[in-house]
Amino acid sequence: MRSNYCGALRNEHINSKVQLCGWVDRCRDHGGVIFIDLRDSSGTMQITVDPDQGTDLFNIAESLKNETVIQVTGKVRSRPEESINKKLETGQIEVLADVLKVLNPVYGNLPFAVSVHDDEPLKEEIRLKHRYLDLRRERMKKNLHLRHATIQTARNFLEEEGFIEVETPILTRSTPEGARDYLVPSRVCEGEWFALPQSPQIFKQLLMVGGIERYYQVARCFRDEDLRSDRQPEFTQLDMEMSFMSQEEILCLNERLIACIWKKIKGKDIKVPFPRLSWQESMDRYGTDRPDTRYGMELVDVSSIVKDIGFKVFSGAIQAGGSVKCIKVEEGNQSISNVRIKPGGDVFNEAQKAGAKGLAFIRVRVNNEIDTIGAIKDNLNNQQKNELLLKTKAKPGDLILFAAGDTEIVHKTLDKVRQFLAKELRLISTGKSKDQWNFLWVIDFPMFNFNKDEKRHEAMHHPFCAPNAKDIGGDPGLWEENLPKARAQAYDLVLNGLELGGGSLRIHNPELQQKVLETIGIAKDEATEQFGFLLNALEMGAPPHGGLAFGLDRIVMLLSEEDSIRDTIAFPKTQQARCLMAQAPNEVSKRQLKELHIASTWVDNE
């Protein structure tokens, strides 16, 4: 149907006869000559329709609506000097049409303009409802091409490193760890259910037992969890697993992979190796295991300095086993007023969202004099004040913000305030930090969290992470005692405060795997029921192995400089996990439910 793509024509095609297909981006009538911007997936070409070419041709051109699908036959020629568009790669040429055929008209009115010349912002709801139209827009086309290029770059890199791509099952069994599963009833096996995979975790480990050694997959994953801007109920991972590699070898290989992607897609040289921070250091310095290191305001523990100053908020927190920590805001005296820190202010509100009751503060004035609330100023002696200023490295003009209480809440509070102020003070939107890619590995995570409500241990990542051998010792008799305090051989890759992915070395000893499952409350009988096939495999010569997975949607979001992963996915769901275009999820017929031996108990109370 066509001889060339619109965006591929150049000066060397002048005087060539071509046949093009695409959508009418816009039509313009200039003094009796009609100009059509014809758009296809490659770009735009100007079509000129001259009345001298025939009345029928001209009448068709006059009747065209935007987004009509047409076929054009004509000759490529140079544009007149005054018509050259240097902004377009095809801007020096045009096609003089001698045949114009409408392949499919537009019926009715379009819900929004698609033209490359129309950049009017649209509500996301209408974009998602008519996604097939939204995909024609330059923004989405660019994002999907970038996504494709990212995947191809990763594939090429991994295949050069000896990896092979293997698909793992989509219909699998439900297991007790992780988020809620999406369940699929089996018609053939009455009363039984499949689960959609939250990750290919167990299957990729079984591939290592099977001797594959280096596996990767662009894997579809499914999690029934609460959503936000960078989460979807179905998402894509760049998933990997490797045998006979140490943690450091895995980190180094993936640093090179990330550097390769950023060089190919963004043209940026990323310095490797990436910094490594232990989980504990990350929490101590930033209050989070996903730190943004493009700016300062690191946390400082001042508990030992302020414990005896007579301020009950501080002393009470420390006596209860908590802590007092602070961040220093350089030149904060000018940029942050007291009103913003006190109840009702925006800085106060950010702290409150994290669970804090409020923030204390000190303003450093000339000659290191301080302004603060009376309860602190009246009880802080010169030695304590000097120690505080020395430890925080505060100078005149700086503002010190304090959080006190349970250390976990203190960390969440100062992390949230730190991120909020970085945006408010434009620390990450101007200058060097605007185009700064601060990658780092967070390592040495705790193996377990302790769930205070349920009074039991939970795996911080998942129950297949290998513990640090130094932490558990070589004697299996000590595993039960040492495991809860052990560090995992786990690692997360963080970029500018966002987790790009993570992984770990895996347990390849069946006894240790059983003990880890017992530690999180999965008894031996239940472990055999839920994970028996994995435990059996580990008994049959499982190699040392490890891996990781990157969130592909999130990587593409960052590379494309979008704010939401929904703008990097062809057909995403909303934050209510709905597809507005296909109207999914939807009710199904009673006949379908009967075939699956399912009865609905849901009652519409509206």
Curated annotation (Swiss-Prot):
The record marks H30 as: Important for tRNA non-discrimination. Belongs to the class-II aminoacyl-tRNA synthetase family. Type 1 subfamily. One of its GO terms (molecular function) is ATP binding. CDD domains: AspRS_core, EcAspRS_like_N. It comes from the Bacteria. ATP binds at R223, D224, E225, Q232, E499, G551, L552, D553, R554. This is Aspartate--tRNA(Asp/Asn) ligase. One of its GO terms (biological process) is aspartyl-tRNA aminoacylation. InterPro entries: Aa-tRNA-synt_II, aa-tRNA-synth_II, aa-tRNA-synth_II/BPL/LPL, Asp-tRNA-ligase_1, Asp-tRNA-ligase_1_N, Asp/Asn-tRNA-synth_IIb, AspRS_core, GAD-like_sf. Keywords: Aminoacyl-tRNA synthetase, ATP-binding, Cytoplasm, Ligase, Nucleotide-binding, Protein biosynthesis. Homodimer. L-aspartate binds at E177, R223, H461, R506. Aspartyl-tRNA synthetase with relaxed tRNA specificity since it is able to aspartylate not only its cognate tRNA(Asp) but also tRNA(Asn). Reaction proceeds in two steps: L-aspartate is first activated by ATP to form Asp-AMP and then transferred to the acceptor end of tRNA(Asp/Asn). GO terms for cellular component: cytoplasm. The lineage of its organism: Bacteria, Bacillati, Cyanobacteriota, Cyanophyceae, Synechococcales. It catalyses: tRNA(Asx) + L-aspartate + ATP = L-aspartyl-tRNA(Asx) + AMP + diphosphate. Its EC number is 6.1.1.23.
